[in-house]
Amino acid sequence: MSRKKLTDIMICGFALFAIFFGAGNLIFPPYLGVISGSNWGIANIAFLLSDPLLPILGVIVTALLGGQATDLGKRVSKHFSIIIGAISIILIGPLFAVPRTGATTHEIFVQSFVPTAPQWITSLIFFGLTLYIAIHSHTVIDAIGKYLTPILLIILLLVFIAAVVQPNAGFQTTTSAGLFSQSFKEGYQTMDALGAALMAGVVISDLTRRGYTEKKEQYQMMFGVGIVSFILLALVYSSLTYAGATVSTVYDSTVQRPALLIELIEQLLGSFGKVAMGIAVSFACLTTSVGLITTCGHYFSTLTNGKLEYKKIVVVSVVLSFLLSLLGVDALLQLAVPVLSAIYPMVIALIFLSIFDRYIVYNWTYTGAVVGAFFIGGIQAIHLFSQMQGGNFLAELATWTNTLPLHQFGFEWLVPSIIGSVVFTVISKFTGMGSKRV
């Protein structure tokens, strides 16, 4: 491999790392470390499979399919790809991810120094800035982002070193039962896999700009870029999981994730580290918020051929994000669980099938896989929503899903997805229903 290719792979790999390295994601690994204690390695591996492996695979396969946001689900149907794309954008936009950036800023930074400060004031300022920048000036965010990522990485490196050199307490002895599944599904909360299809176009455009115009060459570069990004993200998340495990005798599963992160930083790096981390995370959350809001605006404006104006979409998205942020981080995470339980299995099935897309003849192979995955995910989602309302709807079916193979790993939907894929393939082959690969 030439020096130029290696350099470009490193640059693009760091760029993809920066895209997925959202400050809001930092709250998850330390919490996993706390609940896993002595078994933090199992929790860490499960989380890394969910994020960053899935999102990076999503970027790579979408690039292989054509690089458009709607390519991932297009072999199910054009309408399905649009719907799943729109749902993903809404979830990583004004429904969950963006409100969480505002709530995280309040709980990690503002509340740490002014405990009595009301959430609505923080959110009003935060989303006021988001609205202004999203409409008027992206250069501010570019400038902030240029310096924020290195600062955050330096702080996190110091956290890991401090955790290794002077652990605060020790590892709580825990059971590994159900830990892999819980940790894997904790990775759903980052929602990075939902935005992976959008990121593929960004990477492809960057590679094209650098002179890699041949498809085969782009694919080779994409694999290298993905590996670099994965290694960087894995190092960051693993460090935080380990740091969380070192205080697993101090905290338990009831600790709030943002509070845990900032308290961990203070214990390991002192007051200066706490202030530096709070400021860095707040600005990083702002850049994430602006980026996701503008992406949402452009996506729906393009999807409707300009019938929905970019500015109007941005305003509505920001207002909705402001209102939902008032619920707080933990409430937003709880609300997201049922929705992600329904959506994520379908996305994972699409990503893995797309790896072998060139060998899959029948489009119904994809349809069957999605139907099987959604059947299980849908049952669990409805049951979880019911439990949140004090009910127990579909309890027997939900209990049945827990008896399915691979449930202990969080893949109880996999066998039904495979069965659905095989059945739909056979039907398509012998009846001629559905389309074939062109």
Kindly label every feature range from the protein language model.
Residues 159, 166, 179, 363-438:
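A generic transmembrane alpha-helix motif of multi-pass inner-membrane proteins
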